[in-house]
Amino acid sequence: MRKHVLQMEKQLKATKKMLLKDCVLKNDIDFNYDFILPFSNAERIKDVKLIFIGQDPTVRNRKSREKIKTTLNLDKENSLKKYLKTVYDIMQVDIEKEIYATNLYKCFFNKPPADDQTILTRQFKIWMDLLINELSVLKNTFVVTLGEPLINQLIHTNSKKVKDYWDYTGKTKSGKNFKCNEPYENYLQRRIYPIAHQPTWNRNKFYKTYLNDYLEYIKQNERKSSKA
């Protein structure tokens, strides 16, 4: 795995050079800070059982950006890591040995994409191509995505609403007929299980109520898939 991360470091340096030469795309990016490498402590690529994907390392306060060194801040104890620990525990996955975490966009943007969606439209192809290449070594590994803006970009067929995969029936209720986005429905060509990002989960009764149920569904569905 260390070799793969080092290879990604080289690819990100090459991507940075390419972006700096683009008179349009370079204006979106804050080049004062390093691009963020993927996170994994797995010894071997084949040990990875779960891929986490976030959208980008959005930090509005520019001075705080220098503190972000790792995808999803997984090198620090914080509310997001505590939230993701629920995922690891229920799915019986070891964060130190069996996960791989990355972002679709590995740079800091000058403006948060939430303030200007055209940023993602411009930047999408270069970063999606890089992500597909990055994950190509992780054979037959499923993906858990964080947040709705991200699945709007990864998914080309079927719903782009997290709640639809959680079988939302209204009034904070779920029918528990959970589902994933199938490989033929997204650009990554993998099973994608969308979950809410931590801030949304924290303030939303529906996601708080059914998180454990959806995670249990993922675990059971992946067991069935591995036996098929």
Predicted regions span which residues?
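Short, active-site-adjacent cap segments at secondary-structure transitions
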Residues: V59-R60, F108, L150-Q153
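Adenosine ribonucleotide-centric catalytic and binding domains
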Residues: N27-E98, V162-T169
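Short, conserved loop/helix-junction motifs that constitute active-site signature segments
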Residues: Q92-D94, L135-L138, Y184-L188
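Internal catalytic-core helix/loop-beta-alpha segment
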Residues: E96-P149
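C-terminal capping/extension of enzyme domains
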Residues: M1-F31, K111-D129, H156-A228
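Conserved catalytic-core helix/loop/strand module for nucleotide-ribose chemistry
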Residues: L80-A114, Q189-I192
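Short, well-ordered beta-to-alpha junction loops that form the rim of enzyme active sites
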Residues: F39, Q55-D56, L104, T145-L150, ...
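Short amphipathic alpha-helical segments
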Residues: S64-R65, I155-T157
